[in-house]
Amino acid sequence: MTTRIDTRFAELRKQGRSAFVTFLMAGDPDPATSLAIIKALPRAGADIIEIGMPFTDPMADGPAVQAAGRRALDAGMTLTGTLRMIGEFRKDDDSTPVVLMGYYNPVYIYGVEKFLDDARAAGVDGLIVVDLPPEEDSELCIPAMKAGLNFIRLATPTTDDKRLPAVLANTSGFVYYVSITGITGSAAADSTAVGAAVGRIKRHTSLPVCVGFGIRTPDAARGIAERSDGAVVGSALVDALSASLDAEGKATSGTVQAVASLAAALAEGVRSARQAAE
């Protein structure tokens, strides 16, 4: 089964460029504004959209993404609401891949079978569940694959050649390489080291390898895009959203444009990587 993710990477290969992948938290700062931002991302140049599932204990997230999750939860966002929002997005956009990213607990409480049915119906294309290792593939990974969803694994600088085959065994869509050891937004990515790491991963898989964590500027995005199949930006976009809010943490008239403007600049950085490599 070919997913939107597979189709998008095939298109990008023909164009000779890497993907620009965005991350934002569902429902941040409120459901209506969140939907408006997500609708604006493809127009700004996003090739793939990752949407965070708000959770009360996000252990891999840095302060910015944790704050985004708190804002979303305070605004009443739920997993049901997240899926409903994606369904609304799909009314306007049937081609941009959407990946849900988060933790297993909300999915478990929702019910795995019901979650997969509802996610597929809403238009979700893939899942990244950061706290489910390959040893737990029977919990969600295998059922997701059977439901036609890509299950995207994380590889890190500490994932050695002995561990990689297990990480990659049931991975589909793309591999998400975490360029730094730590929480989101905590450091800058080293594009030279990333290039070596991506090359090592590609010796084990034919899947695209996208790189995230530590990409905050168009120049950084270009450097990563020159050395990988995609640059993932989350914390910088979340910071732009946060900076646009009023004193009470509510959306302003400039919130959507603040995020879209940064996304457009980052997208241009990614697209310039192809030009630099030619």
From Swiss-Prot:
Protein name (Swiss-Prot/TrEMBL): Tryptophan synthase alpha chain
Gene: trpA
Enzyme's top EC category: lyase
GO annotations of cellular component type: cytosol
GO molecular function, one term: tryptophan synthase activity
Gene source species: Nitrobacter winogradskyi (strain ATCC 25391 / DSM 10237 / CIP 104748 / NCIMB 11846 / Nb-255)
Source domain of life: Bacteria
Keywords in alphabetical order: Amino-acid biosynthesis, Aromatic amino acid biosynthesis, Lyase, Tryptophan biosynthesis
The keyword Ion transport belongs to this UniProt entry's keyword annotation: no
